[in-house]
């Protein structure tokens, strides 16, 4: 599933992308969040934006050199674990980010509470997000809050 976000009047507006043509018609997204993608969805992103996202099975490598690096094309690649505080099966979910000049791409296996909260806040508070870097920073600060709350319950 591809969720595409654009800024409208200082707020994040979300659009779900169901096919390649829908993806190609968007010219100014600031965040593209890819959840449990099909192989063809990753290909659409590559064709539309020239960005190769890692496949989910490739996210397992979390050696120091794979956590954060700048590629030859100038894109910043970051891999991070986010807590999923599920009562039955609490666990970490690995997320890969690719930050280009003006778009944040994220890819992960399942939707995360932190991501939902960031989307909600950015829709309700105009001006809280102005660009792709703001989205990334907001994801990390919200993750710190969520992780602290989860650990308090232990």
Where in the sequence are the language-model features?
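Peripheral, non-transmembrane regulatory/ligand-interaction domains of membrane transport proteins
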Residues: 1-154
């Amino acid at each position: 599933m591809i969720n595409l976000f654009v800024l409208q009047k200082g707020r994040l507006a979300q659009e779900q992308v169901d096919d390649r043509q829908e993806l190609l018609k968007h010219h100014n997204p600031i965040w593209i969040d890819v959840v449990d993608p099909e192989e063809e969805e990753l290909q659409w992103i590559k064709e539309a934006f020239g960005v190769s996202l890692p496949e989910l099975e490739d996210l397992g490598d979390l050696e120091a050199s794979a956590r954060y690096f700048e590629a030859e094309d100038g894109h910043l690649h970051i891999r991070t674990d986010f807590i999923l505080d599920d009562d039955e099966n609490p666990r970490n979910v690995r997320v890969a980010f690719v930050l280009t000049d003006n778009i944040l791409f994220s890819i992960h296996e399942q939707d995360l509470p932190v991501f939902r909260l960031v989307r909600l806040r950015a829709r309700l508070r105009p001006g809280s997000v102005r660009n792709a870097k703001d989205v990334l920073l907001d994801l990390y600060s919200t993750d710190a809050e969520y992780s602290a709350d989860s650990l308090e319950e232990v």
